[in-house]
Amino acid sequence: MKTPYTKYLIIIIALIGFNCGSNTAATTQTKTPAPFNLITEKQFNDLFPQRKPFYTYAAFIKAVHDLSQIKVKVTRRGISFYQYIRTDKTTGKSVTVREDQDFNADWNKKKPESIYIVDYADFCMAKDAQTNKKELAAFFANVAHETRNGSIGTYDDGLMYIHEIDTSNAYLAPNDVYPATKGKKYYGRGPIQLSYNGNYGRASDFIFGDKKVLLNDPKMIETDPVVAFETAIWFWMTPETDKPSAHDVMIGKWQPNATDKAEGRTPGFGMTINIINGPVECNKGDDVKPMNDRMGFYQFFLKQFGATDLNCACSCGKMMPYYY
């Protein structure tokens, strides 16, 4: 485990409060992100009283801070040709970390193009205090469910697994851009239980600017708690093909198109479940234990944060999942 990040925590604790909607501490002149003051160390520990010692408040805060220095411009042409330009805000340097073969081919330049900016400084900091609290409650609810080791209906047992119990499955999938490294396994690791070589490689591109870091050393997610939390935040903040990010859903940025509406997808917490584990938990009615467990955690954490979601579309029971 890494040593505590004392210096950084002193700064954070001095500024702690629930006023996370205020970004006055950050200025465009210094480009310093506002301190993540949505949750105190005591509150974090109270939410996860049985957590593994691996999962510390210090590691979570450092992951939030470090990722806030990264912004990625995602350009998609056609269905599946991508370019990622990663900017390190501390240096101002931008580097193309992914550009698919034929991305700039003449025939491909004629394809429809979409551009999306992923700014990790927006994690639970993009809106007013109440919206930010709801987003953090939703993030922690999904994390707690993924890593719980207790009885359904109790909400004190999140962050108890660093990796999934059964590590015999390597979770390998054909991927030309992010091929698996020989002999490595990509089973679920970290707070969001990141799985498959494609996700490991893509997360590595965004977090490190080098896909090989996590493809070659997937165990880093279970040995470095900061990286573990970074992968969870990455998954939360980053859209995939036509699937929006959970972040955009919770801040109200994502709105369903005609296809989404026809397939029952609506803004709200239920959509985050669809994004994370839709094929297993969604479009199967409302009597699905994992889905209801996530919903229970969400309502529990909202209460702890002094927030409400009165019009919560919490269920994904009638939503078609994404199959990619």
Placement of each model-derived feature along the sequence:
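Short, well-ordered loop/turn and helix-capping segments at boundaries between secondary-structure elements
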Residues: 200, 238-242, 303-307
